[in-house]
């Protein structure tokens, strides 16, 4: 109560922050008359002047007022659009590395031009991030007119570009790109072998459009570049056949936690089936040797019980394609990990693709924290303000609308069953269509959108096909409807463009990230491009365009008279933000509008998260068939349920981040070291240090500090030196010398190893030797890093069990991850040293550049592995072929230098009985 009173007197923190920007807005407005008198050339020259002032010591903050005023004047001249005062405030929030919450239709795309221009003056590159290729291309082409007028270059990063095109786009002053492309380019860059092959510049400033969608909804989804493992498609298909034979009592499903577990009876039944199929390696399903089978069974069970076709995924062209739960869009190229996607493919009887090994990965949380400065825009961020502040250190500022919102938001109507709810929805749609009020119906899945479409067809309405140009003409007849979901995404722009005409009925899955406003009366630009595509420029086209604009103006008045856009929600989403995004489609720029949600006790949110108290109250009221209950108390109860879900999801994201930060810190170290190695022309010093460290560690292992020669393991050291360094040295004779000590032995071995490598350098030439050293070092680092990622992934899956032993799983994970990282660096030194001591180059022509990385990495979107083994770069150079095989009779078991080339699956020549790859071959 006191807090509310204080806010009335002093205003909220948000109000005070907005007021703080007003003096700058007034200063920008004062400059407007002066800038209007400048010629186009004089206005353009201000960019050169600003850059000169930056070079002389001024800051970007010093230039904010004149730079913003310059952009506003340029937009007026080039596009006929003038930034409103509230848009100037939005631009300042973005420049201050905050999140500007702006309602739908308030011109976020135009707002971005202000901070983008200002920050691009620094010459370090500004990234504008969108959720899909269509929006990246549209916004870039649209706003490039302003940037180009002011002398800045604009680049676009979309799927399908080669590295040269990407490099050129990133070199521009302003680069528009999708979050996926940016993340994948970063990962690919850190798999390249030369600095010149990388495409991105250092991360300076980014503005993220639909920031809640990217940094909240997709935060837990890592970007992964992976390569296929062995094909096990038959095994997935076999396991899948067992799942339908289980009954409901054989497993328990927890929809809240999205988990499923077999009961005792289920385990016994599964063991019996696996034994009969001769797949079980021992009596019990949970014996250690059956761990892999248990994993496959669990994933198959998840695929059948937790994932629904046309809700979580669709089947298209012999593929299982994931559907984004927040946007309703298909995500081709994205695959569930850990065998779940293969289990879904087996369930749907499509071709089972090979499993993948992770080569590189990063979450959006960690990728966007690479930027020096970050800003974001969205229509709905206030509900997640705490998370933005906590994880990204970004403040959310609600920007006032240019005109007051006139939309009416009704309380929810709750019915007992889905059937009754859909009856009421169809009735309301027909009423709106009859009075020519456009309706947008939001659904949560493809399945629900098609169910409603079928109900409308039964009521006598027909579905529009926007592949027919006639669908664009004039007002809707009130007897047709359009469906916008992942199946019809090719028609998306057309459907949204016509969703605001009088009498239009549009059924859509979640509207997040659609990017296109629903304009009452229709979208003039879309109609002109479609209807006048074949009409050349000239008086006739100008007259036709004017006629279309007049028609749309008349249609807008008709839609306004009918009450504006009516947004009808068919159920509540888990997140209040997604519901607000749907509501926000109505009432843009001060237009009237209406919104209402229809619910039933059978909805997922009500069924899984709704309180028993709510359900009990509704039943006690004794609702009759077709009756609804409407009360603000129900809205509050549902909001509490949504807040619970949001809090749970936030905790999950926070927990994921804590674990991912461990990997992220290690990733930074590896990528920074890798970049330094790539930048170095000569890595000889690094290689020498590694060799000396390896020798020091070897000697310390067999000759303890301050020990006597009789305590030394001379034979062990002799074998280790032959094994790792391929050197046959008189270590036993050295040990017999009077007064000999460990450090002296170390120095002698180092001297011999250095002489051996110096002779190789003299034999093959320093330039070629430097190339070989760099190649082996980078390839070995990449190979070990991939193994390390896999080990951390396995560790993360089981570390939670430590909690049962009263130990903190996170601290245990940090400790063991550090030990694994240290061990990886030790192995790197040892393997690089061993490989370089062994390398023999058959012929020595002049070295050429390393082959391009594109021949060796996986395509981010297709999932096809193009990354060769760790020796790819060497094998691509025939002149670097290693020595040929040596006959077995000529190999000395105690001297690896006599073995020559040994097949990885051959018995090791040392006589251990192991395969070469598991013995000495681990260095090869």
Curated annotation (Swiss-Prot):
InterPro entries xrefs: Helicase_ATP-bd (IPR014001), P-loop_NTPase (IPR027417), SEC_C_motif (IPR004027), SecA (IPR000185), SecA_CS (IPR020937), SecA_DEAD (IPR011115), SecA_motor_DEAD (IPR014018), SecA_preprotein_X-link_dom (IPR011130)
Taxonomic placement: Bacteria, Pseudomonadati, Pseudomonadota, Alphaproteobacteria, Hyphomicrobiales
Membrane-related topology note: Peripheral membrane protein
GO cellular component: cell envelope Sec protein transport complex; cytosol; plasma membrane
Co-factor(s): Zn(2+)
Keyword annotations from UniProtKB, A to Z: ATP-binding, Cell inner membrane, Cell membrane, Cytoplasm, Membrane, Metal-binding, Nucleotide-binding, Protein transport, Translocase, Translocation, Transport, Zinc
Top class in the EC scheme: translocase
PROSITE patterns on file: SECA (PS01312), SECA_MOTOR_DEAD (PS51196)
Stated role: Part of the Sec protein translocase complex. Interacts with the SecYEG preprotein conducting channel. Has a central role in coupling the hydrolysis of ATP to the transfer of proteins into and across the cell membrane, serving both as a receptor for the preprotein-SecB complex and as an ATP-driven molecular motor driving the stepwise translocation of polypeptide chains across the membrane.
Protein name: Protein translocase subunit SecA
A GO biological process held by the record: protein transport by the Sec complex
Pfam families: P-loop_SecA, SEC-C, SecA_DEAD, SecA_PP_bind, SecA_SW
EC number: 7.4.2.8
Gene Ontology molecular function: any one: metal ion binding
HAMAP family named in the record: SecA (MF_01382)
This protein's record includes keyword DNA repair: no
């Amino acid at each position: 109560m006191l807090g509310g009173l204080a806010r009335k007197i002093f205003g909220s923190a948000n109000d005070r922050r907005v007021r703080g920007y007003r003096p700058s807005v007034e200063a920008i407005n004062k400059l407007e008359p002066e800038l209007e008198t400048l010629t186009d050339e004089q206005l353009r020259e201000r960019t050169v002047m600003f850059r000169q002032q930056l070079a002389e010591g001024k800051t970007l903050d010093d230039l904010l007022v004149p730079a913003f005023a310059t952009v506003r004047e340029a937009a007026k001249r080039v596009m006929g659009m003038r930034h409103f005062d509230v848009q100037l405030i939005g631009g300042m929030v973005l420049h201050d590395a905050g999140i500007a919450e702006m309602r739908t239709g308030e011109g976020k795309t135009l707002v971005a031009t202000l901070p983008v221009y200002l920050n691009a003056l620094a010459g370090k590159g500004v990234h504008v991030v969108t959720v899909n290729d269509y929006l990246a291309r549209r916004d870039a082409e649209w706003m490039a007119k302003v940037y180009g007028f002011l002398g800045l270059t604009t680049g676009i990063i979309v799927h399908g570009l080669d590295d040269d095109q990407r490099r050129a786009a990133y070199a521009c002053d302003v680069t528009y790109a999708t979050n996926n492309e940016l993340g994948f380019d970063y990962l690919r860059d850190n798999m390249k072998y030369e600095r010149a092959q990388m495409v991105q510049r250092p991360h300076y400033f980014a503005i993220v459009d639909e920031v809640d969608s990217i940094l909240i909804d997709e935060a837990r989804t890592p970007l992964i570049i992976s390569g296929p493992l062995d094909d096990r498609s038959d095994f997935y298909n076999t396991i899948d056949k067992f799942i339908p034979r289980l009954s409901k009592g054989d497993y328990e499903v927890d929809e809240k936690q999205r988990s499923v577990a077999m009961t005792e009876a289920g385990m016994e039944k599964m063991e019996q089936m696996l034994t009969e199929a001769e797949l079980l390696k021992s009596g019990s399903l949970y014996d250690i040797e059956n761990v892999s089978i248990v994993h496959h069974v669990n994933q198959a069970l998840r695929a059948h019980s937790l994932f629904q076709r046309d809700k979580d995924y669709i089947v298209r062209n012999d593929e299982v394609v994931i559907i984004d739960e927040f946007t309703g869009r298909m995500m081709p190229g994205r695959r569930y990990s850990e065998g779940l996607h293969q289990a879904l493919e087996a369930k749907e009887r499509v071709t089972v693709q090979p499993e993948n090994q992770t080569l590189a990965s990063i979450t959006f949380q960690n990728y966007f924290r690479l930027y020096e400065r970050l800003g974001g825009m969205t229509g709905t961020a206030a509900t997640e303000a705490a998370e933005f502040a906590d994880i990204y250190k970004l403040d959310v500022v609600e920007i006032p609308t240019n005109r007051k919102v006139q939309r009416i938001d009704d309380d929810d109507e709750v019915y007992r069953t889905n059937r009754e709810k859909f009856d009421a929805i169809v009735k309301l749609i027909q009423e709106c269509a009859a009075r020519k009020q456009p309706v947008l119906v939001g659904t949560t899945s493809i399945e629900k959108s098609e169910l409603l479409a079928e109900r409308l067809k039964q009521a006598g309405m027909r579905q529009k096909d926007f592949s027919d140009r006639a669908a664009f003409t004039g007002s809707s007849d009130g007897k047709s409807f359009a469906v916008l979901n992942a199946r019809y995404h090719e028609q998306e722009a057309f459907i949204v463009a016509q969703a605001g005409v009088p009498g239009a009925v549009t059924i859509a899955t979640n509207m997040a990230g659609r990017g296109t406003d629903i304009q009452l009366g229709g979208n003039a630009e879309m109609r002109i491009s479609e209807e006048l595509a074949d009409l050349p420029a000239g008086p006739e086209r100008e007259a036709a365009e004017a006629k279309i604009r007049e028609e749309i103006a008349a249609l807008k008045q008709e839609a306004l008279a009918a009450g504006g856009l009516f947004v009808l929600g068919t159920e509540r989403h888990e997140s209040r933000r997604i519901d607000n995004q749907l509501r926000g489609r109505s009432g843009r720029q001060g237009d009237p509008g209406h919104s209402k949600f229809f619910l039933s006790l059978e909805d997922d949110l009500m069924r899984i998260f709704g309180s028993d108290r709510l359900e009990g109250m509704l039943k006690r009221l004794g609702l009759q068939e077709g009756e609804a209950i409407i009360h603000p108390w129900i809205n509050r109860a549902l909001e509490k349920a949504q807040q619970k879900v949001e809090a749970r999801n936030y905790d999950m994201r926070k927990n994921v981040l804590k674990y991912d930060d461990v990997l992220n810190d290690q990733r930074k170290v590896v990528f920074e070291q890798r970049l330094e190695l790539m930048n170095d022309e000569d890595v000889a010093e690094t290689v020498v240090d590694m060799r000396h460290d390896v020798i020091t560690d070897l000697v310390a292992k067999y000759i303890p500090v301050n020990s006597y020669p009789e305590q030394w393991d001379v034979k062990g050291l002799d074998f280790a030196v032959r094994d790792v360094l391929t050197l046959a040295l008189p270590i036993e004779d050295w040990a017999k010398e009077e007064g000999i000590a460990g450090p002296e032995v170390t120095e002698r071995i180092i001297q011999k190893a250095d002489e051996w490598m110096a002779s190789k350098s003299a034999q093959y030439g320093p330039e070629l030797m430097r190339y070989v050293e760099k190649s082996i070092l980078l390839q070995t680092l990449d190979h070990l890093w991939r193994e390390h990622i896999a080990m951390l992934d396995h560790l993360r899956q089981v570390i939670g069990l430590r909690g049962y032993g009263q130990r903190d799983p996170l601290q245990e994970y940090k400790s063991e991850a550090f030990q694994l990282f240290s061990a990886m660096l030790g192995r790197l030194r040892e393997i690089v040293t061993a490989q370089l001591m062994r390398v023999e180059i058959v012929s020595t022509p002049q070295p050429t550049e390393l082959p391009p990385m594109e021949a060796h990495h996986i395509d981010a979107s297709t999932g096809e592995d193009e990354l060769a083994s760790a020796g790819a770069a060497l094998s691509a150079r025939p002149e670097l072929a290693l020595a040929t095989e040596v006959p077995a009779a000529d190999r000395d078991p105690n001297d690896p230098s006599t073995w020559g080339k040994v097949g990885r699956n051959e018995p090791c020549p040392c006589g251990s009985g192991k395969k070469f790859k598991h013995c000495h071959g681990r260095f090869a």
